[in-house]
Design a protein with these regions (language model features):
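Short, well-ordered beta-strand segments
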Residues: 1-4, 169-170
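Conserved beta-loop-beta connector loops within the AMP-binding
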Residues: 144-172
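Gly/Ser/Thr-rich phosphate-binding loop
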Residues: 26, 49-54, 63-136, 149, ...
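Conserved AMP-binding/adenylation subdomain of ANL enzymes
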Residues: 1, 9-50, 65
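AMP-binding (ANL) adenylation modules
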Residues: 6-10, 156, 174-175
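Short acidic loop-to-helix transition motifs that present clustered carboxylates
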Residues: 35-38, 60, 84-85
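Beta->alpha turn/N-cap motifs
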Residues: 55-56, 175
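Membrane-embedded alpha-helices of multi-pass transport/permease systems
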Residues: 15, 56-59
Length: 175
């Protein structure tokens, strides 16, 4: 089940906490505001919520007055809408034992273009398999979503740019 408390007027909240659960038949635990984190933590615990999609600003609220066991059922915590500060990510993981996965997007990508993913289970009968691509890297917004292409350019010249420098990203979808 998913905790559905993000405002619905931005595409992020509308798409990931309303339309995704409705289309895919995922149970939703709804609450009208993401600001009342103590009440939300009670709901997570009461209904054994497994997915929480939030923003870094709202995650900060859980760090004040929410107990570790209240978020024990969560298997996936994803943030978007703003940069995830390392301090918030580390504090949340330390306090609740849950890795926070950061994503990136904009309204035009409805609303996700990149997202970090939980680490996959190792392949192979003995558990000694390998993974082709890392699914999570701290400080990044994760892998590009399937169906998108990206061109990375220098923001000043428009020329090609390598990925670990200041840059402009151009996204293109199928249409």
């Amino acid at each position: 089940s998913i905790l559905a408390c993000l405002p619905l007027f931005p595409s992020f909240g509308c798409t990931v906490t309303l339309w995704y659960p409705v289309i895919y038949g995922v149970n939703m635990v709804t609450f009208p505001t993401p600001l009342e984190t103590r009440k939300l933590a009670e709901l997570v615990e009461k209904y054994s919520v497994t997915v929480m999609i939030s923003t870094p600003t709202f995650l900060r609220g859980y760090l004040r007055g929410v107990h570790r066991e209240q978020l024990g059922s969560l298997r996936l915590v994803v943030t978007g809408a703003e940069k995830l500060p390392k301090t918030v990510s580390e504090a949340f993981e330390e306090r609740f034992g849950k890795r926070v996965l950061e994503g990136y997007g904009l309204t035009e990508t409805s609303p996700v273009s990149n997202v970090n993913l939980p680490d996959p289970e190792p392949l192979g009968e003995d558990g000694d398999g390998h993974v082709w691509l890392p699914s999570y890297r701290p400080g990044s917004v994760g892998q590009l979503m399937p169906g998108l292409a990206v061109r990375i350019t220098d923001p000043e010249t428009g020329g090609p740019r390598v990925i670990h420098q200041s840059r402009r990203s151009w996204l293109k979808g199928a249409d």
